[in-house]
């Protein structure tokens, strides 16, 4: 892995193996039984998946030495932001707002 020492790579691979084992220990429930029983099994499975996800974040943050939350993005002041509603803007593949900029931000 780019820019990392071999020892750090081994620790990261160990963390990934631990996380893989955690996810493999919680297979999706079988589709047998009554509707209520299946629903309860899926509900418990989702709760375990949430716990595994939380544990995985903690394991990775511990091994990588940084928090799982992203660093806050620095945004420009609101006064400098504007909405461009022109149809000839060259951004293909994105939706353009059809509203007007009048009254935006005013109560």
Curated annotation (Swiss-Prot):
Keywords: AIDS, Host cytoplasm, Host nucleus, Host-virus interaction, Methylation, mRNA transport, Phosphoprotein, RNA-binding, Transport. It is found in: Host nucleus, Host nucleolus; Host cytoplasm. It comes from the Viruses. A motif (Nuclear export signal and binding to XPO1) lies at residues 73-84. Residues 18-26 are annotated as: Homomultimerization. Asymmetrically arginine dimethylated at one site by host PRMT6. Methylation impairs the RNA-binding activity and export of viral RNA from the nucleus to the cytoplasm. Residues 26-48, 81-107 are annotated as: Disordered. The modification Phosphoserine is found at residues 5, 8, 92. GO terms for biological process: mRNA transport; viral process. Residues 36-48 have a biased composition (Basic residues). Disulfide bonds: none annotated. GO terms for molecular function: DNA-binding transcription factor activity; RNA binding. InterPro entries: REV_protein (IPR000625). A motif (Nuclear localization signal and RNA-binding (RRE)) lies at residues 34-50. One of its GO terms (cellular component) is host cell nucleolus. Residues 89-101 have a biased composition (Low complexity). Belongs to the HIV-1 REV protein family. The RNA-binding motif binds to the RRE, a 240 bp stem-and-loop structure present in incompletely spliced viral pre-mRNAs. This region also contains the NLS which mediates nuclear localization via KPNB1 binding and, when the N-terminal sequence is present, nucleolar targeting. These overlapping functions prevent Rev bound to RRE from undesirable return to the nucleus. When Rev binds the RRE, the NLS becomes masked while the NES remains accessible. The leucine-rich NES mediates binding to human XPO1. Escorts unspliced or incompletely spliced viral pre-mRNAs (late transcripts) out of the nucleus of infected cells. These pre-mRNAs carry a recognition sequence called Rev responsive element (RRE) located in the env gene, that is not present in fully spliced viral mRNAs (early transcripts). This function is essential since most viral proteins are translated from unspliced or partially spliced pre-mRNAs which cannot exit the nucleus by the pathway used by fully processed cellular mRNAs. Rev itself is translated from a fully spliced mRNA that readily exits the nucleus. Homomultimer; when bound to the RRE. Multimeric assembly is essential for activity and may involve XPO1. Binds to human KPNB1, XPO1, TNPO1, RANBP5 and IPO7. Interacts with the viral Integrase. Interacts with human KHDRBS1. Interacts with human NAP1; this interaction decreases Rev multimerization and stimulates its activity. Interacts with human DEAD-box helicases DDX3 and DDX24; these interactions may serve for viral RNA export to the cytoplasm and packaging, respectively. HIV-1 lineages are divided in three main groups, M (for Major), O (for Outlier), and N (for New, or Non-M, Non-O). The vast majority of strains found worldwide belong to the group M. Group O seems to be endemic to and largely confined to Cameroon and neighboring countries in West Central Africa, where these viruses represent a small minority of HIV-1 strains. The group N is represented by a limited number of isolates from Cameroonian persons. The group M is further subdivided in 9 clades or subtypes (A to D, F to H, J and K). This is Protein Rev. It comes from Human immunodeficiency virus type 1 group M subtype C (isolate ETH2220) (HIV-1).
């Amino acid at each position: 892995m780019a820019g990392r020492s071999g020892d750090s790579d081994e620790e990261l691979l160990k963390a990934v193996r631990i996380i893989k084992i955690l996810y493999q220990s919680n297979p999706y429930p079988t589709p047998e039984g009554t509707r209520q029983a299946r629903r309860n099994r899926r509900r418990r499975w989702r709760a375990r998946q949430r716990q595994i996800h939380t544990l995985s974040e903690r394991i990775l943050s511990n091994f990588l030495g940084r928090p799982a939350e992203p660093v806050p993005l620095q945004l420009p002041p609101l006064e400098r932001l504007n909405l461009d509603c022109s149809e000839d803007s060259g951004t293909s593949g994105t939706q353009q707002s059809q509203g007007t900029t009048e009254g935006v931000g005013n109560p």
